[in-house]
């Protein structure tokens, strides 16, 4: 086993990963034919019940903080639009990213209300409530930390419902508080619900290319319950969800951004999914019904997250909500890598240089394995004459050949697989970094230096992939080889070119990691070879032994 054969192993692992990702993308949930529906009527949390027939439109109320711009429809009090002011739609754009939207082409809303026997949002009780607002727009003033938007509705029975949205400075969590003042003469049975509704098929303006080259990022629903910390739920799943739990949350996810309803922790809640239209999907919760006696008041509340997937803030809002950051099947490596990267960034202030430092750290930790790898390869090269003589002596007796080879390895204390172990360990780290770069919103539009303005996107001029290919070429030329097969030699010759082509579409942050890793390999290679020379296991005078 030598360095150039290791390149074949890397290529095999890499191609296997590419095939697996391509299969995952091809077999991802496929949207049904689009049938656009624009409505502010909820499914009320019961898949068997039909939505309320369309009724008169309410007034649109605009709400602005330092990080959010929301549009609330007074018909039902749903949030129909949400713009994230700190996140541009595209690199260099002054237009903020729009997460929630209500247009003829696309619907993505955060709905909430009161159902139950006497709930004003119950379809059996007529059209959804038309709330009254004191203002048409609300803006968080300078120096103020909290903004409250109260909406009021008086039912036919005289009951007064106050729905208050509470937003805080530099926060993406929106508290939705209900106060029910039962001024009627009969008890009110009410159930609080919150749900997210979205068109399953993305129109062109919403398709931001989250299916990056060889990477499929999840777009769909998810939930957390007492039994499952984090469970994805595809839009095209036939069986509707029905889970009763205490605490937890329901969410809709996409690359970098999420919306989530977090119900109150006291009492139990039922999580559900429904399809209110051919091209619509919902996920939501229903709380335990409460009874408000005549003359009494009752408070019900839930919290909506609408914003970027900021792991620290999401974890503070609800347990396991930070798991919505999609790091794929290598999340257990990606998460600590991101925490380390974020810690380094806190001192340096540049994500690109942080990636360089984390590369040195990873390669430093793995140096003992790298040294063992090169030592094992050197010993294997020293055994080549004995192995060749053994082949000539034994001939075609494969069983005897295998037995004597293993005996030789044992007597010489050589592990034939010793050169593979570091590669097997490095590959998951490489892929975990890939997922981290594509799943962490902190790296979205994060600049490095010179022409690299977005570490999560490919190099626009392909300079980094070419540099990566050059470093691979030098590693190949500096590595001793025992490859004699002409076909393998040709494959080795073109390996840097093949990898360069692969990396043309990879995130520049990942290519940067690989370049630095290759440079560290060259340095470590020279240090290790000097030690091997002293032991008589390596000669700089010739590349073939």
From Swiss-Prot:
Its main location: membrane. InterPro entries: Membr_insert_YidC, Membr_insert_YidC_N, YidC/ALB3/OXA1/COX18, YidC/Oxa/ALB_C, YidC_ALB_C, YidC_periplasmic_sf. The keyword Transport applies. CDD domains: 5TM_YidC_Alb3, EcYidC-like_peri. Gene3D superfamilies: 2.70.98.90. It is a multi-pass membrane protein. GO terms for biological process: protein insertion into membrane; protein transport. Keywords: Cell inner membrane, Cell membrane, Chaperone, Membrane, Protein transport, Transmembrane, Transmembrane helix, Transport. Residues 31-54 are annotated as: Disordered. GO terms for cellular component: plasma membrane. The chain crosses the membrane at residues 6-26, 342-362, 417-437, 455-475, 496-516. One of its GO terms (molecular function) is membrane insertase activity. Belongs to the OXA1/ALB3/YidC family. Type 1 subfamily. This is Membrane protein insertase YidC.
């Amino acid at each position: 086993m030598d360095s150039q054969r290791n390149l074949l192993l890397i290529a095999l692992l890499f191609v296997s990963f590419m095939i697996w990702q391509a299969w995952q993308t091809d077999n991802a949930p496929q949207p049904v034919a689009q049938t656009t529906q624009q409505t502010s009527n909820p499914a009320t949390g019961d898949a068997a019940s039909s939505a309320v027939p369309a009724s008169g439109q309410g007034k649109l109320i605009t709400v602005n903080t330092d990080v959010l711009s929301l549009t609330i429809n007074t018909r039902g009090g749903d949030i129909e639009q949400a713009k994230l002011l700190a996140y541009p739609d595209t690199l260099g754009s002054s237009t903020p990213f729009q997460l929630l939207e209500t247009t003829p082409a696309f619907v993505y809303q955060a709905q909430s209300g009161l159902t139950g026997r006497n709930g004003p949002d119950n379809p059996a009780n007529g059209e959804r409530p038309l709330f009254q607002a004191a203002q048409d727009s609300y803006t968080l003033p300078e120096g103020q930390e909290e903004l409250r938007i109260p909406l009021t509705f008086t039912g036919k029975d005289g009951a007064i419902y106050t729905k208050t949205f509470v937003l805080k400075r530099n926060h993406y969590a929106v508290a939705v508080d209900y106060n029910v003042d039962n001024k009627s003469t009969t008890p009110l049975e009410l159930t609080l619900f919150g749900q997210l509704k979205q068109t399953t098929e993305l129109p062109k303006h919403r398709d931001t290319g989250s299916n990056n080259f060889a990477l499929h990022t999840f777009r769909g629903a998810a939930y957390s319950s007492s039994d499952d910390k984090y469970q994805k739920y595809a839009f095209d799943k036939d069986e509707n969800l029905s889970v009763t739990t205490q605490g937890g949350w329901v969410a809709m996810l996409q690359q970098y951004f999420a919306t989530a309803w977090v119900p109150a922790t006291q009492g139990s809640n039922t999580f559900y999914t429904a399809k209110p239209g051919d091209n619509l999907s919902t996920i939501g919760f229903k709380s335990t019904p409460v009874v408000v006696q005549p003359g009494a008041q009752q408070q019900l509340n839930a919290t909506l997250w609408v914003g970027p997937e900021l792991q620290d803030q999401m974890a503070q809002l609800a347990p396991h909500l930070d798991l919505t950051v999609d790091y794929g099947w290598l999340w257990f490596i990606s998460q600590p890598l991101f925490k380390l990267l974020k810690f380094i960034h806190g001192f340096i202030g540049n994500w690109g240089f942080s990636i360089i430092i984390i590369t040195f750290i990873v390669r430093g930790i793995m140096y003992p394995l790298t040294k063992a790898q090169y030592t094992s390869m050197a010993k294997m090269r020293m055994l080549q004459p004995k192995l060749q003589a053994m082949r000539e002596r034994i001939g075609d007796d494969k069983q005897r050949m295998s037995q004597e080879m293993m005996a030789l390895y044992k007597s010489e204390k050589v592990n034939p697989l010793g050169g593979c172990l570091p590669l097997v360990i490095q590959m998951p780290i490489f892929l975990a970094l890939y997922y981290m770069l594509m799943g962490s919103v902190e790296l979205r539009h994060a600049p490095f230096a010179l022409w690299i303005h977005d570490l999560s996107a490919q190099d626009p001029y392909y300079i980094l992939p070419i540099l990566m290919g050059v470093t691979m070429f030098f590693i190949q030329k500096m590595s001793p080889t025992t490859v004699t097969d002409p076909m393998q030699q040709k494959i080795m010759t073109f390996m840097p070119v093949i990898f360069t082509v692969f990396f043309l579409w990879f995130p520049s942050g990942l290519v940067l990691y690989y370049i630095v890793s290759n440079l560290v390999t060259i340095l470590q290679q020279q240090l290790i070879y000097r030690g091997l020379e002293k032991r008589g296991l390596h000669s700089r005078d010739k590349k073939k032994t």
